[in-house]
A protein has these predicted regions:
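N-terminal helix-turn-helix DNA-binding core of bacterial DNA-binding proteins
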Residues: 11-54, 65, 81
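Short amphipathic alpha-helical/adjacent loop interface patches that line ligand
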Residues: 4, 26, 48, 59, ...
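Conserved catalytic core of two-component sensor histidine kinases
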Residues: 56-57, 120
Length: 134
């Protein structure tokens, strides 16, 4: 677990938010909105494992920055769905590209073929764990 925490910290340091109008909390929520499409604030809070009130604050910041927009759920007009704006999508893409470029370079420069295979297998296992319902 410590290794995953260290790698996450390294990825963040390789893609600093200094020139971006968001925090890491904003960016992770925005990334999930881009990946999942329109989502309610409650669903997003559950997925991010934060309180609904905390997510409301995060969404307010994203909304103020023009990175998300609200719309009604076509199947249930009482629900408000949050979607990424084109600016929000571009921000996620730019941030992800920077981190992915660093990681790809590090993998190709530091790992041999066997280590690369092991890493791919470990990623599959971590995906399975992340998707677990328990």
């Amino acid at each position: 677990m410590r290794a995953m925490t260290r790698l996450r910290a390294r990825l963040r340091s390789e893609a600093p938010l200094d020139d971006l109008p968001v925090t890491w909390s904003h960016l992770t929520a925005l990334h999930r909105i881009v990946e999942q499409g329109p989502v309610t604030a409650t669903e997003l809070a559950q997925a991010e494992h934060v309180r609904r009130q905390s997510m409301a604050e995060t969404l307010a910041g994203l909304r103020a920055g023009g990175l998300i927009t609200d719309g009604r759920d076509p199947s249930d007009g009482r629900k408000v769905l949050v979607s990424a704006t084109p600016a929000g999508r571009a921000l996620v893409e730019r941030s992800a590209a920077t981190r992915e470029a660093w990681l790809s370079k590090a993998i190709s420069n530091m790992l041999d073929a066997e280590e690369h295979r092991v890493l791919l297998r470990a990623a599959e296992i971590m995906d399975r764990l992340a998707d677990a319902k328990e």
